[in-house]
Amino acid sequence: QEIVELNSVAKSYGANILIAYNRRFYESTLALKELIEIDGGATSCIFEFTEWSHIIGPLKKGPGVKESWFLANSSHIADLAFHICGYPKDFSAWHGGSLNWHNASERFCGSGITEKDIMFSYHADWSAPGRWGVEVLTRKNRYILKPLEKLQVVRIGSVTVENIEIDDENDLKYKPGIYNQIKAFLECEDTMFCLIEEQLKHIDIYNKIAGYD
């Protein structure tokens, strides 16, 4: 409801509101997108958005924040995967369990196909070990963002995980992604951002993944 009202106010003032998903601007993300294009495009994608319940549970947050934690936090990783491979045009989602700070769901899995005809799947278990990660597959390579700040590759015909060197000086000097994000904002390069009207469409996808009514 808040995003609907915010979008309405923005339109009434002729303003653009950009969602600050900084993972889109990581040097690892930018390098990955270039490599995917060189390979001829992605064929499939896997992502994980496991959260550390033992850390998040005790946190003091405002009303409703932890109860909608997927929207507040985990959507960063879903946005990254879908930014790279396209947003779902058809998918199925399953969720189960509950936590004392997140009643809607505890475990998540799903799969589908994006608007770019790329098959995807995801998984998360908020009561088990894990971390955020994205894997994008092409006909030549499997690219791994895990952690998201680093880019690794498994080449076809191999099982060896190799590190890909990237120029991540600004991501190390500042909070990752922030330098490129602010630069794009100041130079009015909005194409890399998620616009609020786009996010309004994505909310239904995120609610389905998270199990929110």
Question: PLM ranges: what are they?
Answer:
Residues 12, 183-213:
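C-terminal helix-rich "cap/oligomerization" subdomain common to oxidoreductases
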Residues 145, 168-183, 194-197:
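Active-site loop of classical SDR/Rossmann-like NAD(P)-dependent oxidoreductases
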Residues 23-92:
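Predominantly a Rossmann-like dinucleotide-binding segment in NAD(P)-dependent oxidoreductases
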